[in-house]
């Protein structure tokens, strides 16, 4: 029967049959709307939270990068030098040595008349004038400095004698304002009596090196005879109760009449193993001090030419520690030399050079706490160098009239220059990180005591004489190696975990 002919009730039932499959929620329309709003809010909150979290991570990484950039960039910054004061000491004697006190409050100038003048570093006001105890009628013919740290020096006399003295400061603090008060002094740790190195012959050159209570002197007389002397302090058991002294010196001498020298300069290394004899043309000959006192006929064991071409040395000085020898010449070049050992063969090798200018180098002054030094040339151009980093931190003309001498403070924060006219100029120095350079971080560096350049990381040691080694290559290689071995274990675990999770979720 056609659907059109069905009764109305039956037709209504047929039309209503599909509606029986629709599931009607038991919740009211208000609760459904509330649930939808809550779901929408949760989705929105999660979306914002994830976005904020991701952006925060990126911002945090950028801030870390900015902080590291802020901390690292100053490591490569150069030094700054600013004039602090200038004054005239009114001293006509030639300068043998300039030195600055530990905290840059006072300075000392030793003249060729044997008088040490101590003065305020900022004002130039005289604090004390002390004459070294030189025998009556004797004149100074040569000078040698042990090291800037010890303050010990030797004066060679025209009588063939040598006086060993030390400049120092006694420190006390005022009771009212706790102000630091310095009292300069010249003392004689190895006795006031001069040491005889030649008989009635002026000492043309002299070298001094000390270690604790032991001292070694080397000198050449005008005739060319080389003399060696060792002195060791012998303290008696009752020295603590003897206010008058109680100390004696055991002295050992050796006159090497078979070695006739000319006007060579003498230097003793920091370990007192070698005597460097350097002539005016830069030829260095080395005598072993371990056998010089006992061998019947000691001879020079090593030799090397310290200059290139027709250059002649103008100033020579040991770097901090007494291992490296700095040589400045009349062509403006500065070179670093030290002894190396390969297969039981010892050689004096040129490690690196610093070409500052074509003007002759006048003076070299090593720092007391870092492997750095200061140079000044004949035109008054001052440069700050670091040997390990092979870096020139500063260069500038600070003495228009030329320079006679210069000194850098123990902390490296002050520079004192005596000009060609005898005026003193004090300069404030800020040179925080001279030992950092791109080559020191990523290239092979030839460190003191090593036979060849190498990648080494060793940032500190027990003494200031240590040469810091900042190569990042060992650290980077170690980090990458550790990451590689970690990935060998982490990668299989991650892959297997992903597979397991995928099957579990399925």
Model-predicted regions and their roles:
Residues 486-506:
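Transmembrane-helix boundary motif in ABC transporter permease subunits
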Residues 41-72:
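Hydrophobic alpha-helical transmembrane signal-anchor segments
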Residues 54-61, 477, 481-489:
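Hydrophobic alpha-helical transmembrane segments of multipass membrane transporters and ion channels
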Residues 107, 152-153, 216-217, 275, ...:
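Hydrophobic beta-strand positions that form the internal "hydrophobic ladder"
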Residues 116-121, 162-167, 226-231, 284-289, ...:
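WD40-repeat beta-propellers
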Residues 2-30:
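N-terminal intrinsically disordered, acidic low-complexity segments at the extreme N-terminus
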Residues 104, 113, 150, 158-159, ...:
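Surface-exposed loop/turn positions within WD40 beta-propeller blades
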Residues 33, 37-45, 75-109, 114, ...:
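Periplasmic/extracellular loop-to-transmembrane helix junction in inner-membrane transport proteins
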């Amino acid at each position: 029967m056609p659907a059109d002919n069905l009764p109305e009730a039956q037709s209504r039932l047929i039309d209503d049959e599909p509606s029986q499959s629709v599931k009607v929620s038991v919740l009211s329309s208000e609760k459904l709307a509330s649930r939808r709003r809550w779901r929408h809010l949760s989705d929105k909150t999660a979306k914002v939270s994830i976005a904020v979290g991701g952006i925060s991570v990126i911002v945090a990484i950028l801030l870390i990068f900015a902080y590291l950039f802020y901390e690292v960039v100053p490591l490569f910054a150069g030094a700054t030098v600013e004039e602090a004061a200038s004054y005239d000491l009114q001293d006509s004697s030639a300068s043998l040595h300039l030195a600055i006190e530990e905290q840059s409050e006072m300075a000392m100038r030793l003249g060729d008349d044997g008088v040490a003048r101590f003065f305020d570093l900022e004002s130039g006001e005289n604090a004390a004038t002390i004459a070294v105890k030189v025998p009556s009628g004797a004149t100074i013919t040569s000078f040698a400095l042990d090291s800037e740290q010890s303050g010990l020096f030797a004066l060679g006399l025209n009588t063939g004698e040598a006086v060993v003295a030390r400049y120092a400061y006694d420190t006390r603090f005022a009771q009212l304002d706790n102000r630091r008060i310095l009292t300069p002094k010249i003392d004689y740790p190895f006795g006031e009596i001069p040491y005889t190195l030649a008989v009635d012959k002026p000492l043309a050159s002299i070298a001094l090196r000390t270690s604790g209570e032991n001292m070694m002197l080397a000198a050449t007389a005008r005739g060319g005879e080389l003399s060696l002397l060792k002195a060791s302090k012998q303290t008696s058991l009752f020295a603590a109760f003897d206010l008058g002294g109680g100390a004696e010196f055991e002295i050992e001498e050796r006159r090497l009449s078979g070695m006739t020298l000319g006007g060579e300069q003498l230097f003793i290394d920091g370990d007192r193993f070698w005597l460097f004899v350097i002539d005016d043309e830069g030829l260095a000959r080395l005598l072993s001090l371990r056998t010089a006192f006992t061998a019947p006929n000691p001879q020079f064991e090593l030799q090397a030419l310290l200059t290139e071409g027709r250059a002649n040395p103008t100033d020579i000085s040991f770097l901090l520690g007494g291992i490296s020898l700095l040589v400045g010449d009349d062509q403006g070049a500065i070179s670093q030399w030290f002894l190396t050992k390969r297969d039981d063969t010892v050689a004096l090798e040129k490690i690196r050079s610093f070409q500052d200018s074509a003007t002759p180098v006048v003076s070299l002054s090593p720092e007391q706490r870092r492997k750095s030094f200061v140079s000044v040339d004949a035109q008054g151009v001052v440069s700050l160098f670091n040997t390990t980093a092979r870096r020139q931190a500063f260069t500038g003309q600070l003495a228009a009239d030329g320079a006679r001498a210069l000194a850098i403070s123990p902390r490296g924060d002050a520079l004192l220059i005596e000009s060609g006219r005898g005026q003193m100029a004090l300069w404030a120095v800020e040179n925080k990180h001279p030992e950092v350079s791109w080559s020191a971080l990523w290239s092979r560096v030839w460190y003191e005591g090593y036979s060849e350049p190498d990648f080494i990381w060793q940032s500190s040691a027990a003494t200031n004489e240590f040469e810091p080694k900042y190569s990042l290559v060992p650290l980077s290689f170690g980090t990458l190696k550790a990451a590689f071995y970690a990935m060998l274990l982490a990668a299989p675990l991650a892959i297997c975990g992903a597979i397991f999770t995928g099957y579990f979720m399925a």
